[in-house]
Amino acid sequence: MKTTLVIMAAGIGSRFGGGIKQLAPVGLNGEIIMDYSIHDAIEAGFNKIVFIIRKDIKDAFKEVIGDRIEKICKDLDVEIAYAYQELSELPEGVELPEGRTKPWGTGQAVLACKEVLHEPFAVINADDYYGKEAFVKLHDFLVGYAPEKANQFCMAGFILKNTLSENGAVTRGICETNEEGYLTAVHETSNIVKTPEGAAVDNDGQLTSINAESYASMNMWGLTPEFMQTLEDGFKAFFANMGNKDILKAEYLLPIYIDELLQAGRVSVKVLDTNDKWFGVTYKEDKDYVVKSFARLIEAGVYQKNLFEDLK
């Protein structure tokens, strides 16, 4: 079965270079975090990759990342496709509000794939390292897809303590699950900091402890092809319900929309737990830690020095 990895990379800056965190080299041969996600997805069995970018960065993206990955994937019989998130791509009858410059969010980003997505798929952020286990579990879930399972989704559930930064506060989707391991709610929680006891929310210096063993969503979802129509319907409703005061800043966010569907009883989301440690460059100070972490993984034999060598 065809299974696709969708990489949300439209947030990459329009200038490529040392200042763009998504393109900061972290591997021994200049690999970026995205390289490791692509490697792990292919190793797990994904056989198609869709990059969501913006048209204004297409040439630079292909020069820095895309062409190199296309060559690797061609040799591995993995299909590559592009989708473009644009501010002006709106539902029929909706005009771009004057003065709007902010992108419409991750929901619109995934919706940009509508013409190239016809199979079960996983969605990830371009600049997060998720570890190998989550890709294997998502792939194994997605290959069980059938049309009668159109509303059965999954997500990778990371342990909160494995997703925190040593260098400052982070925002995470704290998850509630039932006894069967299905998601019941996602609470977007800001200002989470690492503490000697585990984790806490920092409210202007007032720390409130939270369970560091909670599941956290890192925007790694397993979804079905039918979801694309639901997502489009949701985007139309997003505009229909939006007040004028929100028109310049409101965002259509994937986890919030999935939670709306969940609360309405329209979908189920199986939480696939992973004990892998998440890495990301939330703060510039995180980069050294990420580089050292990949060096340790290579030393331990988790990855080859030449990253894609073991897939050939």
Predicted regions and their residues:
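N-terminal glycine-rich phosphate-binding loop and ensuing alpha1 helix
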Residues: 2-70, 85, 119
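A short, conserved beta-strand element in the Rossmann-like catalytic core
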Residues: 13, 129-131
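Short phosphate-binding loop-to-helix
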Residues: 70-119
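Short, surface-exposed amphipathic charged segments that create phosphate/polyanion-binding patches used
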Residues: 91-103, 168-173, 285-289
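Conserved core of the sugar-phosphate nucleotidyltransferase
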Residues: 132-220, 225
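A C-terminal functional module that forms or caps the active site or interfaces directly
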Residues: 232-267
